[in-house]
């Protein structure tokens, strides 16, 4: 269902987030993430006037992960920033993502390593959305998914159960799509 029709309004700012996922020839996987901010009108900053339509932020983050979804490499680039010579020096800090696992304590690890003055607000928020992008990208390749038809005899329950309201273990979504796992929960 789409959003309701808005009242009369004027665009002031556009933030775009884009993530591409790649399977590499060496067996690793890359997530390339980019965040951009553009103002419609000129904006006066401490560093000078940024004309409308020109990037205020154009920031990129690439992480390389293995099949266990552990980050084995990371890099960041700041191609447009409000404080040139300052904002764009933080890129090397994002190597601190190496060793974190996207499925186990990732957001807490990001906070500990890159929050506040340890990182860039926008690159760090970009990092925080990578786990769900990885799940979408690698379902059936790295993360095993199931069709829920009840014929699946694997001993572990599907990872997506209890990860959102639609697939809560005691709900109608799991009863319909993963009936074996609702029954297993009730009988335990």
PLM regions and their residue ranges:
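N-terminal intrinsically disordered, cationic/polar leader segments
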Residues: 4-48
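Active-site- and interface-proximal helix/loop "cap" or "latch" segments in soluble metabolic
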Residues: 37-188
């Amino acid at each position: 269902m789409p959003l309701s029709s808005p009242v009369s309004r004027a665009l002031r700012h556009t933030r775009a987030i884009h993530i591409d996922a790649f399977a590499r020839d060496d067996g690793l996987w890359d997530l390339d993430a980019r965040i951009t901010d553009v103002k419609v009108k000129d904006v006066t900053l401490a560093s000078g006037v940024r004309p409308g339509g020109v990037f205020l932020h154009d920031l990129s983050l690439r992480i390389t992960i293995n099949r266990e979804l552990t980050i084995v490499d990371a890099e960041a680039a700041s191609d447009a920033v409000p404080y040139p010579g300052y904002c764009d020096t933080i890129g090397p800090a994002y190597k601190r993502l190496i060793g974190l696992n996207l499925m186990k304590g990732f957001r807490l690890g990001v906070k500990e390593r890159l929050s506040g003055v340890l990182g860039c607000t926008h690159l760090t928020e970009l990092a925080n959305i990578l786990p769900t992008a990885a799940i979408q990208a690698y379902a059936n390749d790295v993360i095993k998914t199931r069709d829920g038809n009840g014929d699946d005899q694997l001993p572990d329950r599907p990872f997506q159960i209890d990860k959102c309201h639609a697939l809560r273990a005691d709900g109608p979504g799991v009863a319909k799509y993963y009936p074996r796992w609702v029954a297993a929960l009730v009988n335990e």
